[in-house]
C-alpha cells in the first residue's frame, strides 16, 4: 500500500512467508490462522493495540497473507501492512462482545469465500489470544479439519535477521538508559510509583547509536520491582509505598524498539547487603559467565543451563526452574517467544542469530536477586551480550 512505512523490506517479509509455508507443508497444514499479535506483526507489519478483540492473519497456499479484524482496526491494517486492500478484511462491530453472534462465524465464511472451505486449517490452540469458545465455533463452522499449529510461526522467528538484531541492539541501548536512571533516582523515601515514572520516561525517550537517536516503545511486561520480602516472589509490580534503607529491590525491565525487546535485570540494595546475598552475587556472576561461554552455535539450551547449575551446585545453592527463554518481537502479556527454554533437559540446538534472555534469578527466603543478560548466539565462540551494563549487585547508601 502507498505511504505505508514498514519496519522491514518487502524481500524480508517475502522470505518470512516462504519460511512459514515450508513449515506448514511439513505439518500437513494447507491454511494457517494466527491470532498471536507478534506473529501477525512479523508476517505483515501490523502493529496496533487491538488484540483484545478477535483478529488474525490467514496464510493460504498462495498469495499474500490476509489480515482479518474489527472494522475500525482494518484502517490501521491499511496503514501498517504491506498487503493490498483486497487482503484487508473486517467484520462489523455487531460481532464485538455480543452474546448473539461471534466473530469466528465471520472468519469461517471468509475462509470458505477464499476457496479454503475444506482445507486443513492450522490454529494456535496454545495461545493467549485464542479462546475455547472461538475454537469450538470455528470447529463447528469450518468444513475441513482443524490442526494444532501452536508455535509454528514462533519457531520460524527463532533465527533473527540482521535488521532484527539491529532493533534488539537498540532496545539494549534503551534498557541501559533505564537502569542508569533507576540508580540515579533510587533513594530511601522515594515512592515506588515515582521511580516507575522515571523508568517509563527513560524507556520511551529511547537511545542513540551510530545512526543517530531513536525512540522507545512500550514493553510487553510492566516494570517488576519488589523490595525486601516481596522480592522473594518473582512477578510483583509496584505500589505507592516509600523505599526504605536496609532492603534490596530487583528491577525486571526491558528496553523495547519497534516491538523488539532486550530484557536486562539488576538489583539495588539500599544500605549494606547481607553476606548470603553477596555470596549469591558471586555465584550468579560465575554462573552467568559459564553459561555465556556454553552458548555457542551447535550446543544446546540444556548445555547452557547445565553450565549454570554446575556453579550453583558448587556454591550449595538450590534452584528450581528454567534460567532463560528466547526473546525478540512481542506483545503483552509476555516478551518471551515461548519456544525453547534454558533448562537442563531442553536439547534445542542453538543456531547463529538466535537470541535469548539468560535469566538465572534467585528468589530466596528473605530476599531476591536478579542479574540477567540478553544474549545473541554468534557464528562461533561464546554468545554476545546485547547490553553493556555492569553485571553486579548495586549498592547505594
Give the label of every model feature segment.
Residues 1-397:
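Active-site neighborhoods and metal-handling regions in enzymes and metal-associated proteins
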Amino acid at each position: 500500500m502507498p505511504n505505508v512505512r514498514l519496519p522491514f523490506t518487502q524481500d524480508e517479509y517475502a522470505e518470512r512467508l516462504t519460511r512459514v509455508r515450508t513449515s506448514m507443508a511439513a505439518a500437513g497444514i494447507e491454511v494457517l490462522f494466527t491470532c498471536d499479535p507478534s506473529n501477525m506483526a512479523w508476517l505483515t507489519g501490523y502493529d496496533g493495540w487491538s488484540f483484545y478483540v478477535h483478529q488474525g492473519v490467514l496464510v493460504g497456499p498462495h498469495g499474500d497473507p490476509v489480515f482479518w479484524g474489527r472494522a475500525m482496526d482494518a484502517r490501521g491494517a491499511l496503514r501498517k501492512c504491506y498487503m493490498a486492500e483486497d487482503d484487508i478484511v473486517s467484520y462489523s462491530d455487531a460481532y464485538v462482545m455480543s452474546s448473539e453472534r461471534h466473530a469466528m462465524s465471520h472468519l469461517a465464511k471468509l475462509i470458505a469465500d477464499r476457496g479454503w472451505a475444506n482445507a486443513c486449517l492450522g490454529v494456535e490452540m496454545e495461545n493467549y489470544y485464542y479462546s475455547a469458545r472461538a475454537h469450538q465455533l470455528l470447529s463447528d463452522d469450518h468444513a475441513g479439519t482443524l490442526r494444532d499449529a501452536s508455535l509454528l510461526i514462533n519457531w520460524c522467528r527463532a533465527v533473527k535477521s540482521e535488521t532484527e538484531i539491529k532493533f534488539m541492539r537498540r532496545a539494549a541501548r534503551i534498557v541501559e538508559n533505564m537502569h542508569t536512571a533507576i540508580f540515579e533516582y533510587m533513594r530511601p523515601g522515594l515512592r515506588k510509583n515515582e521511580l516507575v515514572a522515571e523508568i517509563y520516561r527513560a524507556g520511551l525517550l529511547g537511545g542513540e547509536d551510530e545512526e543517530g537517536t531513536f525512540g522507545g516503545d512500550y514493553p510487553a511486561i510492566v516494570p517488576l520491582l519488589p523490595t525486601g520480602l516481596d522480592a522473594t516472589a518473582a512477578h510483583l509490580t509496584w505500589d505507592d509505598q516509600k523505599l526504605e534503607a536496609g532492603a534490596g529491590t530487583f528491577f525486571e525491565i526491558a528496553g523495547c524498539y519497534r516491538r523488539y525487546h532486550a530484557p536486562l535485570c539488576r538489583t539495588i540494595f539500599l544500605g549494606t547487603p547481607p553476606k548470603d546475598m553477596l555470596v549469591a552475587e558471586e555465584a550468579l556472576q560465575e554462573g552467568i559467565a559459564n553459561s555465556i561461554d556454553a552458548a555457542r552455535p551447535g550446543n544446546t539450551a540444556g548445555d547452557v543451563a547445565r553450565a549454570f547449575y554446575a556453579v550453583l551446585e558448587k556454591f550449595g545453592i538450590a534452584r528450581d526452574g528454567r534460567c532463560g527463554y528466547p526473546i525478540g518481537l512481542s506483545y503483552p502479556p509476555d516478551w518471551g517467544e515461548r519456544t525453547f527454554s534454558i533448562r537442563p533437559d531442553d536439547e534445542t540446538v542453538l543456531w547463529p542469530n538466535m537470541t535469548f534472555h539468560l535469566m538465572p534469578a534467585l528468589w530466596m527466603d528473605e530476599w531476591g536477586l536478579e542479574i540477567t543478560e540478553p544474549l545473541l548466539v554468534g557464528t562461533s565462540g561464546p554468545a554476545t551480550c546485547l547490553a553493556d551494563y555492569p553485571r553486579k549487585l548495586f549498592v547505594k547508601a
